């Protein structure tokens, strides 16, 4: 599913190029989105601008970012960063379904971008003019994640779509030309989510354009976790997109935010709805290598499902997971937004946890404030986006050394 070419080129802060002229046709129920914070975190419930304790150790490599989210190292050794932008002033009220107060309606604009932190510590803009939104409580979303496949840069768009004030720039995946900063959509995920609805969406927390939050490369495809509908999709480089699993069918509204791959299995982490309850988040194992066939009426395993990803295992004990990564030690690391029990995220309560081989869960980094994403670098250090939901100009990139 390929859209017409769209490009964004930075030149003195101006974006040049055209965007695909298209109008989304809504096929979903009216939005009652009172808790999009479940997928996007929430400034309404946290004073993230307050003074917070710093992380337990580490170095600030860059600052002044706009709610940075996912990040990935490129073949050139540089770190590429998803920047949410600052939203915009465009309103689509009366045009399509809107999020309800106190979260919506949203206002959009082409202010999101992709940043590059090179090996000398210089921060530059790689691509700009990408869709971004701001809601009534100040949450920002634009570029959600970045990944490299066959040395080409792909970016996941989470701030697009008509319901977010960007009717001509949907949520989806774009391919970025690193030579000139131009970008093209390879798939329209806004339209895909509407044409392939989840089995059990939460009507009180529904986003028509979805909330694609994280993306990884697995088996030569781009796997995307959508947090609001609870679906995981896979997209090939030609734009062909398929639904891998509908998590809502077996798990309900758990707000999956992250996915990691190990061999042929996928590992999904979830945020859980707010208010926060400690250790309610899980790591869910998905596998296609399951021999179990359920014959219970109404629950019977269909023949077509035997070769698909199914839930194989689940491990609780985590809180508000926003990213999962495997380390060089083969162990799984989880980035937590905040472990404040019985409430909402607090500055300084973000952590990185490690699931050890004996099953224990160990804190390896603490003192983070609303982290948005993490990745391991070629030096085996952890790179984390800190202040990932704190407003324009507050975001940081941290480098943390953890013993593996």
Identify what each model region corresponds to:
Residues 110-115, 171-174, 231-234, 281-285, ...:
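A short loop-to-beta-strand structural motif that recurs across blades of beta-propeller domains
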Residues 64-76, 111, 132-152, 193-222, ...:
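Beta-rich, blade/repeat-based domains predominating
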Residues 118-122, 177-181, 236-240, 287-291, ...:
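Short loop/turn segments that connect beta-strands within beta-propeller blades
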Residues 375-404:
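Blade-level signature of beta-propeller repeat domains, shared across WD40, Kelch, NHL, RCC1
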Residues 90-110, 163-169, 227-228, 275-281, ...:
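Short, solvent-exposed loop/turn segments at conserved positions within beta-propeller repeat blades
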Residues 122-138, 181-207, 245-251, 296-314:
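Surface-exposed loop and turn segments in beta-propeller and other repeat-based domains
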Residues 85, 159-161, 228, 272, ...:
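Residue-level signature of beta-propeller blades and closely related beta-rich strand-turn architectures
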Residues 80-83, 155-157, 224, 267-269, ...:
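Residue position within the beta-strands of beta-propeller blades
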């Amino acid at each position: 599913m390929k859209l017409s070419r769209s490009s964004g080129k930075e030149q003195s802060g101006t974006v040049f190029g055209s965007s695909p002229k298209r109008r989304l046709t809504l096929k979903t129920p009216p939005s009652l989105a009172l808790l999009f914070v479940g997928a996007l975190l929430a400034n309404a419930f946290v004073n993230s601008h307050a003074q917070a304790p710093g992380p337990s150790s580490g170095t600030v490599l860059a600052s002044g970012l706009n709610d940075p989210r996912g990040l990935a190292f490129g073949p050139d050794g540089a770190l590429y960063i998803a920047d949410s932008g600052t939203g915009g002033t465009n309103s689509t009220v009366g045009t399509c379904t809107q999020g309800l107060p106190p979260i919506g309606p949203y206002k959009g604009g082409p202010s999101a971008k992709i940043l590059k932190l090179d090996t000398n510590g210089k921060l530059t803009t790689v691509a700009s003019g990408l869709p971004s939104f701001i809601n009534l409580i100040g949450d920002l979303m634009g570029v959600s994640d970045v990944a490299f496949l066959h040395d080409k840069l792909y970016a996941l768009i989470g701030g697009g779509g008509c319901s977010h004030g960007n009717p001509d720039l949907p949520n989806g995946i774009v391919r970025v030309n690193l030579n000139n900063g131009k970008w093209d959509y390879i798939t329209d995920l806004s339209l895909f989510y509407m044409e392939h609805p989840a089995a059990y969406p939460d009507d009180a927390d529904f986003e028509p354009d979805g909330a694609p939050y994280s993306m990884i490369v697995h088996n030569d495809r781009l796997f995307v976790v959508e947090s609001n509908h609870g679906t995981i999709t896979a997209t090939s480089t030609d734009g062909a997109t398929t639904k891998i699993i509908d998590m809502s069918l077996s798990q309900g509204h758990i707000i999956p935010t992250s996915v990691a791959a190990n061999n042929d299995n996928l590992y999904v982490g979830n945020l859980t709805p707010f208010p926060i309850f400690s250790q309610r988040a899980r790591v869910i194992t998905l596998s296609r290598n399951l021999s179990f066939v359920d014959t219970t009426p109404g629950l019977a395993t269909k023949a077509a499902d035997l070769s698909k990803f199914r839930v194989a295992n689940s491990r609780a004990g985590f809180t508000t997971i926003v990213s999962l990564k495997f380390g060089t030690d083969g162990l799984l690391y989880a980035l937590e937004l905040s472990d404040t029990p019985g409430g909402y995220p607090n500055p300084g309560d973000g952590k990185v946890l490690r699931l050890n081989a004996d099953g224990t869960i160990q804190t390896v980094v603490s003192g983070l404030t609303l982290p948005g994403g993490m990745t391991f670098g070629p030096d085996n250090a952890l790179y984390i986006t800190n202040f990932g939901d704190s407003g324009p100009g507050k975001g940081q990139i941290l480098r943390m050394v953890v013993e593996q």
